[in-house]
């Protein structure tokens, strides 16, 4: 459960690993005192968890950028999806270990991007 929102639609960036930027939908303090990145998505139809890997990479990258910019330690991420077909909300949660796993996958993708589009 959410205790309070600490960031909403905030632009974040980091110079870590070549740098990246994005706008996090929400960072909230939970009732247990930990913090979560919350990402809101819309879809035409319900999503299977195996279809949302890109979303998981995104929230993991946000979690690190939140630390780099604000020194707030993110312990979980939540992906909330609203779909037009059933109008039933979907909710996917990631713990600290999931965030580490997906951040490493994000770094692999970022490295490939910088190989394709070198800065220098």
Kindly label every feature range from the protein language model.
Residues 1-6:
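Acidic-basic catalytic patches of nuclease active cores, encompassing PD-(D/E)XK
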Residues 7-117:
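Mg2+/Mn2+-dependent nuclease catalytic core
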């Amino acid at each position: 459960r959410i205790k309070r929102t600490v960031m909403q639609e905030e632009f974040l960036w980091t110079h870590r690993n070549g740098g990246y930027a994005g706008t996090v939908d929400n960072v909230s303090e939970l009732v247990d005192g930990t913090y979560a990145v919350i990402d809101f998505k819309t879809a035409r139809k319900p999503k299977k968890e195996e279809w949302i890997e890109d979303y998981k990479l995104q929230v993991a990258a946000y979690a690190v950028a939140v630390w780099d910019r604000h020194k707030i330690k993110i312990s979980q991420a939540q992906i909330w999806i609203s779909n037009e077909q059933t109008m039933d909300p979907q909710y996917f949660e990631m713990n600290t270990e999931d965030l580490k796993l997906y951040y490493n996958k994000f770094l692999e993708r970022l490295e490939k991007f910088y190989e394709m589009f070198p800065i220098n």
